UniProtKB/Swiss-Prot annotation:
It comes from the Bacteria. InterPro entries: FAD-dep_OxRdtase_2_FAD-bd, FAD/NAD-bd_sf, KsdD_DH, Succ_DH/fumarate_Rdtase_cat_sf. It comes from Mycobacterium tuberculosis (strain ATCC 25618 / H37Rv). Pathway: Lipid metabolism; steroid biosynthesis. Pfam families: FAD_binding_2 (PF00890). FAD binds at residues 23-54. This is KsdD-like steroid dehydrogenase Rv0785. One of its GO terms (cellular component) is plasma membrane. Keywords: FAD, Flavoprotein, Lipid degradation, Lipid metabolism, Oxidoreductase, Steroid metabolism. GO terms for biological process: lipid catabolic process; steroid biosynthetic process. The keyword Oxidoreductase applies.
Length: 566
């Protein structure tokens, strides 16, 4: 599905757009900005949406996404025998977030409000606008600690039928043909205009036209300047994941050394510029050291943006080894604790790890994040989806990474596999005996129906959930079983993705100053605001919460701005 929004009217580029009036300006045409614009337009207000990229990039990172949504006690869960509740979800959220700072007051208020939304009207509100949900519910971030610690106690990851593009299209369709909504692409905001202690507009640079495809780097050559005025400005410009300089600048000391090698899970235009611009205008920025970067990144053999990486969404069965060939500690199993794994890796002195698995595991347990890596789900082709899951071998996109990727090796014996791993570039040579000891010890634990090995126990527990048993988790077996071969190893990189801190706001998305009072006329939503309040997730996330955070905070910003304008 191509979402180019070619039928949506643009503000006239360059000096002809000078002085265009609007009730509200939205900076950023990603999901949060689109939702905010819909709320404003529904209330009869004139909206101008500015974005530094071309119209091909409408929808921002949501377009590239898997379309996962965090829902609580949904019909999809109940059909699968999952007993969820608001109370359990809030327990999981707060245990995961671990709020512990004075500046976490508003983020925690947002957390309570968001769980209310996810357990309440979120599903019905989205379905009324056209959302369709895939019937199997995924179980992300399983935790592995105690009941009050990190992780989802039950599966809550609901996949949009049509993935990210279908979710974006819900709001694009609402804005299409609305005469009160205008887009100004290739308009890069450089400054928020502050007059009389209030934000009254924006100034910036008109960039030269670009016909680059979605996600590809575009020119920053200036062809003019602009200034627009409005009663409200909503910043919905995204995070810092494409700006490795900012990622490194804000890297938390508690996470160990700053990685030297990073892949990018987002395009270069996810640059975090507006965070600093808002701060210069008086906005409080909190929790800049909280980030969400994935540890299962692989190099894209067909990159769209610089250092383009793809995340593996793994099932729980792969053996996870560090760069020295030692098994990661409990409970750092695939899909259990992203941040805990990241901290272990950075403190290990290396920037990569290994999955060791076999053909049987990769066939069922490897999914690649992103709509372009899931053409059956994205294209809403049920027949193709069923065929791809029923036939022997991994899904086509996974097989393509095995065949063409630079991070995968396979062999018929473990000794041959370790030799192949050692041939990959930029690796510390692995000792065969160290790897063999980890594999052999793990394989001994699957002989019985019970085990002291925490990962094997977790795999068996996961298979008691119908969704995992049917489509996600293989039965425990020896990695070295010839019938399950060949053996496979995947070199995993750290992949930048989400900004968890950001511009501080109240529950109406009003931007706050350092003294805690609102900066009149300014609102923030989406990743630039830490998905709500300056960090609704705290230190960690439960997954399916980023798109939902953009929707919830974008809705709050649109409604809050409309109320104040009226």
């Amino acid at each position: 599905m191509a979402l180019t929004c070619t039928d949506m009217s643009d503000a006239v580029a360059g000096s002809d757009a000078e002085g265009l009036t609007a009730d509200a300006i939205v900076v950023g045409a990603g999901l949060a900005g689109l939702v905010a614009a819909c709320e404003l337009a529904d209330r009869g207000l004139r909206v101008l949406i500015l974005d530094q990229e071309n119209r091909a990039n409408v929808g921002g990172q949501a377009f590239w996404s898997f379309g996962g949504l965090f829902l609580v006690n949904s019909p999809e869960q109940r059909r699968l025998g999952i007993r969820d509740s608001h109370e359990l979800a809030l327990q999981d959220w707060l245990g995961t977030a671990a709020f512990d700072r004075p500046e976490d007051y508003w983020p925690e208020q947002w957390a309570h409000a968001y769980v209310d939304f996810a357990a309440g009207e979120k599903r019905s509100w989205l379905r009324a606008r056209g959302l369709k949900i895939f019937p199997l519910v995924g179980w992300a971030e399983r935790g592995g600690y105690d009941a009050q610690g990190h992780g989802n106690s039950v599966p809550r990851f609901h996949i949009t039928w049509g993935t990210g593009p279908a979710l974006v299209d819900i709001f694009v369709r609402q804005l299409r043909d609305r005469p009160t909504v205008r887009f100004a692409h290739r308009h890069q905001v450089d400054k928020l205009i502050v007059e009389g202690n209030a934000v009254t507009g924006v100034r910036g640079t008109v960039l030269e036209p670009s016909d680059e495809p979605r996600g590809a780097p575009s020119s920053r050559k200036s062809v003019g300047k602009f200034e627009f005025r409005a009663s409200a400005v909503i910043v919905a410009s995204g995070g810092i994941g494409g700006n490795h300089e900012l990622v490194r600048k804000n890297w938390p000391r508690r996470m160990g050394r700053i990685p030297k090698q990073l892949l990018s899970g987002v395009p270069a235009h996810v640059d975090g510029r507006m965070i600093g611009i808002a701060q210069k205008a008086g906005a409080a920025v909190i929790n800049p050291d909280r980030m969400w970067h994935y540890t299962e990144g692989i190099t894209n053999y067909d990159p769209i943006w610089p250092r383009h990486g793809i995340r593996i969404i793994p099932g729980p069965s792969s053996l996870w080894l560090d760069a020295a060939g030692k098994r990661l500690p409990v409970p750092l199993f695939p899909g259990f604790d992203t941040l805990g794994t990241l901290e272990y890796i950075t403190k290990s002195g290396h920037d990569y790890t290994w999955f060791v698995l076999n053909a049987k595991i990769i066939e069922k347990e490897f999914a690649l994040s992103g709509q372009e890596q899931n053409p059956d789900l994205t294209g809403r082709r049920l027949g193709q989806l069923l065929r791809s899951r029923a036939h022997a071998g991994p899904p086509g996109p996974v097989q393509a990474f095995i065949d063409r990727g630079v991070d995968c090796v396979h062999a018929n014996s473990l000794r041959e596999l370790v030799a192949a791993m050692n041939e990959l570039p930029d690796v510390v040579p692995l000792d065969y005996e160290t790897v063999a000891a980890a594999v052999t010890a793990r394989d001994r634990e699957v002989v019985n129906k019970y085990s002291k090995d925490g990962q094997i126990t977790a795999i068996r527990a996961a298979r008691r959930y119908r969704g995992d048993r049917f489509g996600r988790v293989v039965a425990p077996h020896r990695l070295t079983d010839p019938k399950a071969g060949p053996l496979i190893a995947v070199k995993l990189h750290i992949l930048t993705r989400k900004t968890l801190g950001g511009i501080e706001t109240d529950l109406d998305a009003r931007v706050l100053k350092a003294d805690g009072t609102p900066l009149a006329g300014l609102y923030a939503a989406g990743e630039v605001a830490g998905f709500g309040g300056g960090g609704v997730h705290g230190y960690r996330a439960l997954e399916g919460t980023f798109l939902g955070g953009c929707i919830f905070s974008g809705r709050a910003a649109g409604r809050g701005a409309a109320e104040d304008i009226r």
